[in-house]
Amino acid sequence: MVVGNLAILVPSLLLQHFAGPAAPAVAASVRDVAHLAAVDTDVWRGAAPTSLEGYRSLAAAGVTTVVDLRAEPDRRFDDEMLQSFGLRMVSLPIRDGQTPTRAQTDAFLRAVDSSRGTVFLHCGAGVGRTGSMAAAYLVATGQMSGVRATLRNLSVGPPSLEQIAFTIRLQTDRAEQANMLVVAASRMLDAPRRILTTLL
């Protein structure tokens, strides 16, 4: 039992140590948003809010722009309703398990620059696509190297192999997609999870 716990605890502590300083704290009043964390003072990340109250509490905490990375449609909440909370909605669809293009990364940077308040970045679970975009943002703004941003992402949850290869290779002047062998292996290994998510 102790050995099993140490096998989980030691890598977690190492990730926290090497990932660098903790992200700034986020508002404790935000509800119904899993994996909520600050990327920096301007950007928060997390899972898609599961209720209207989640969006309302994000707005009350100072979020003015919501960037949705999901390629799969979410018909539970319409943009007009969310805009009534003072939220500007930006859609940059990325398929589950995949990574942002350079154009999507640039569009995200523009969304952050033009926001009047905090930007909330999310995908479905707030792990892979969100982590890839958050890493691209941190590297593009000179706050972290690709390796450090990858380590921070790993402390949130397990992204796909393709997403790890993308974030670890990030540099300030470019965001390269992983090579085709990594992409093929990643998508094959990640397919059962994506299929299960679609069915549930």
Where are these regions (language model features)?
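Ser/Thr-glycine-rich phosphate-binding loops at phosphate-binding pockets of nucleotides
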Residues: 130
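Short cysteine clusters
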Residues: 123
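PTP/DSP superfamily signal
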Residues: 1-22, 106-118, 133-200
